[in-house]
């Protein structure tokens, strides 16, 4: 709610970082260790290893939204967009205000030339983060193209 009310970009950025930190905490130590290792694999481009570990994360802790979101990100990086969308949908089911998952979904819509889907998704992001310059700019560009 503070994020929605924030009009100051610095304050909004701090809130975003805090939210990401909270989202990245698993419900148990074993899942957290797997999650952290999977992130390390993702960071160095070992995407297959990252998927393997993120899959274990979501098997162990299926209610851990960030596990699904991170696996969606790796699928996106591999170009497996339908698998990414599936994991994004699961992320959003668990955490409907997951602006990161929404941003990834909007990018996929753009890659698929689905401007209507992208516009709707950027509007959803702006409902969560009204000060999101990226979402405002992208929505403006899409609306110009749709006219």
Model-derived features: positions:
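Long, contiguous interaction/recruitment modules in multidomain scaffold/adaptor proteins
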Residues: 1-27
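TPR/TPR-like (Sel1-like) alpha-helical repeat modules
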Residues: 1-7, 113-144
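Short helix-adjacent coil turns
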Residues: 7-10, 45, 79, 113
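Conserved positions within tetratricopeptide repeat
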Residues: 13-16, 32, 51, 85, ...
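Alpha-helical adaptor scaffolds
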Residues: 28-100
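Register position in tetratricopeptide repeats
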Residues: 43, 77, 111, 128, ...
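Residue-level signature of tetratricopeptide-repeat
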Residues: 71-72, 78, 105, 112, ...
């Amino acid at each position: 709610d503070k994020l929605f009310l924030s009009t100051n970009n610095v304050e909004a950025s701090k809130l975003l970082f805090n939210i990401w930190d909270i989202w990245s905490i698993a419900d148990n130590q074993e899942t957290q260790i797997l999650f952290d290792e999977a992130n390390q694999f993702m960071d160095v481009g070992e995407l297959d290893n990252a998927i393997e570990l993120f899959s274990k994360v979501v098997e162990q802790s299926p209610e851990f939204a960030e596990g699904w979101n991170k696996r969606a990100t790796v699928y996106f990086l591999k170009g497996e967009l339908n698998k990414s969308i599936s994991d994004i949908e699961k992320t959003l089911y668990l955490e409907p205000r997951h602006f990161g998952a929404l941003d990834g979904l909007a990018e996929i819509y753009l890659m698929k030339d689905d401007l209507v889907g992208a516009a709707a998704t950027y509007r959803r992001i702006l409902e969560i983060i009204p000060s999101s310059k990226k979402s405002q700019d992208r929505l403006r560009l899409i609306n110009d193209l749709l006219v």
